[in-house]
């Protein structure tokens, strides 16, 4: 049921920059990747942005969570993906001059879940992505793709804990593989 809700809320077809973009949804593999990487905490914890719970759900003003069940963590995760992450992915995809692959959609989904839309849009990776050109068959030009992915490592969140930067760089390398569609889920 949860996967159905996620996919129903995530389907969208639109045209931008002369490119008709089809269904914009993250894959089940992407969902599993993010959940596995974020890990589930059933009790609230402090991070760089305040208190979080579940799979990195930032507890907002007016929400009160000290402890939740796994099912509640899954529900919060799906709501966050549908409410914040996929709309941000759609806004970015609308600006592209080429048809995104599922790998790019999944990579952007993971990046935005981890860095936030504002965090991502302040990077060289984002600037290069928007400047990337299409091939005659409307795919991402390989030279632009390689140039853009080289900047992916800068997409970081502030890390106060020792070793966290290495973990973030590992995640960026995995997201690069997801975008290149060479990642083995």
Residue ranges and their predicted role:
Residues 104-116:
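Short N-proximal segments of mature Sec-exported proteins
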Residues 62-65:
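Extracellular beta-sheet repeat scaffolds used for adhesion and glycan interaction
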Residues 4-14:
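Sec-dependent N-terminal signal peptides
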Residues 95-104:
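Structural motif
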Residues 85-93:
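Membrane-helix exit/interface motif
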Residues 8, 18-48, 57, 68-82, ...:
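Long, amphipathic alpha-helical surface segments
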Residues 48-50, 103-105:
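Extracytoplasmic
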């Amino acid at each position: 049921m949860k996967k159905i809700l996620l996919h129903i809320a995530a389907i969208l077809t639109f045209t931008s920059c002369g490119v008709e973009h089809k269904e914009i949804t993250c894959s089940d593999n992407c969902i599993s990747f993010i959940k596995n990487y974020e890990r589930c905490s059933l009790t609230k914890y402090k991070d760089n942005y305040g208190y979080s719970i579940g799979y990195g759900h930032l507890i907002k003003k007016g929400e009160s969570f000290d402890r939740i069940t796994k099912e509640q963590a899954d529900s919060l995760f799906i709501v966050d993906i549908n409410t914040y992450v996929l709309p941000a992915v759609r806004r970015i995809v609308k600006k592209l001059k080429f048809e995104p692959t599922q790998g790019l959609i999944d990579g952007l989904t993971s990046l935005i879940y981890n860095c936030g839309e504002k965090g991502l849009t302040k990077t060289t990776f984002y600037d290069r992505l928007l400047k990337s050109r299409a091939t005659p068959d409307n795919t991402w030009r390989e030279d632009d793709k390689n140039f853009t992915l080289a900047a992916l490592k800068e997409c970081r969140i502030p890390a106060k804990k020792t070793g966290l930067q290495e973990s973030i760089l590992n995640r960026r390398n995995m997201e690069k593989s997801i975008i290149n569609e060479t990642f083995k889920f």
